[in-house]
Amino acid sequence: MSSMRAERVGEQMKKELMDIINNKVKDPRVGFITITDVVLTNDLSQAKVFLTVLGNDKEVENTFKALDKAKGFIKSELGSRMRLRIMPELMYEYDQSIEYGNKIERMIQDLHKQDR
């Protein structure tokens, strides 16, 4: 399997997952999330779903618990929307790149304030 196919399937999966999680998952523990990336293995057997959650650490933890509990539902919804022979195993990971970028931005702003 080419990695180009894995990238295309990952982009489509990202769109579908956002729709499923925002509109179909009814668990109140699921907070406001943004899926930043979906990385599939070349054989499309596993998908790492990178996401950010708006909220504190407790809300992040509750969101991941809710997504883990709804994994079967999400996978079946995804299967009905995407034409794949085997639906990949979903693994959720917290994406810290947004927080890291915000931290760098604050540091740069602080340096500019010190220069004035």
UniProtKB/Swiss-Prot annotation:
Q: Which PROSITE patterns match?
A: RBFA (PS01319)
Keywords attached to this Swiss-Prot or TrEMBL record, sorted alphabetically, are: Cytoplasm, Ribosome biogenesis
Whether Cytoplasm counts among this entry's keywords is yes
Q: Which GO CC terms are listed, alphabetically? A: cytosol
A single GO molecular function term of this UniProt record: ribosomal small subunit binding
Q: Which GO terms describe its biological process?
A: maturation of SSU-rRNA; ribosome biogenesis
Q: Which Gene3D superfamilies match?
A: 3.30.300.20
**Key word Zinc-finger present in the record?**
no
**What is the annotated quaternary arrangement, including any partners?**
Monomer. Binds 30S ribosomal subunits, but not 50S ribosomal subunits or 70S ribosomes.
Per the similarity annotation, which family is this?
Belongs to the RbfA family.
Checking PANTHER family in the record gives: RIBOSOME-BINDING FACTOR A, CHLOROPLASTIC-RELATED
Q: Please give the name of this protein.
A: Ribosome-binding factor A
Q: State the species of origin.
A: Staphylococcus aureus (strain NCTC 8325 / PS 47)
Which gene is the coding source of this polypeptide chain?
rbfA
